[in-house]
A protein has these predicted regions:
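Hydrophobic face of amphipathic alpha-helices that form TPR/SEL1-like repeat modules
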Residues: 12-16, 49-56, 85-92, 121-128, ...
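Structural signature of tandem alpha-helical TPR/SEL1-like repeats
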Residues: 23-32, 61-70, 97-106, 133-141
Length: 182
């Protein structure tokens, strides 16, 4: 018998984008358990997993609108990965109609919850002219204080910070460079 994933293990898989591969590797044996945890217990990580399975037809018949609904439920409970993925989907028009303003809302929430992918994508949208200049300081602050050991990502962050800085008042930049806890 295949063991059901712990919440922490599932969140780790979601963050590494291996959650759907794991369900398939487990030969789709946990579908009913996953659905129950999403539907009855309303566990955010399981709502996200179930939503992703439905959206892409992994081990179940594809039902994209139901899948997005479960992802939205997980996002509404504050799951950073769900907020980031919905933001990415709206930014790119994946499964949903492209809506970059809506993407900013989801990505801002995920970015505030320290999701680095969301922080980067949010600044990309700001640099494209979406969002509010009032949010630049927070976005700069989060990205400025981010930590990554990926050299390419580090260079991208530095480049984005330099570009965002040009759109900001010098005082806002100074304030944004404060340490994370202040």
């Amino acid at each position: 018998a295949v063991q059901l994933y712990s919440q922490d293990a599932l969140i780790k898989m979601i963050n590494e984008n291996t959650h759907l591969d794991k369900v398939v590797a487990d030969r789709c044996q946990l579908v009913q358990d996953i659905e129950a945890r999403a539907d009855v217990l309303k566990v955010p990580a399981y709502q996200f997993l179930w939503g992703d399975m439905l959206a892409w037809g992994v081990c179940v018949d594809a039902a994209p609108s139901r899948g997005i609904g479960y992802m939205e439920d997980a996002a509404n409970q504050g799951l950073p990965a769900a907020l980031e993925q919905l933001g990415r989907y709206y930014a790119k028009g994946t499964l949903v109609q492209q809506d970059k303003s809506r993407a900013v809302v989801y990505l801002r929430e995920a970015a505030a919850l320290k999701n680095l992918k969301a922080q980067i994508r949010l600044v990309e949208l700001f640099l494209e002219g979406y969002g509010s200049p009032y949010d630049y300081e927070d976005a700069y602050h989060w990205l400025y204080n981010s930590v990554t050991n990926d050299k390419k990502q580090h260079q991208k962050i530095s480049s984005y910070l330099a570009r965002l800085e040009k759109l900001m008042h010098p005082k806002a930049v100074r304030q944004a460079k404060r340490p994370m806890d202040s």
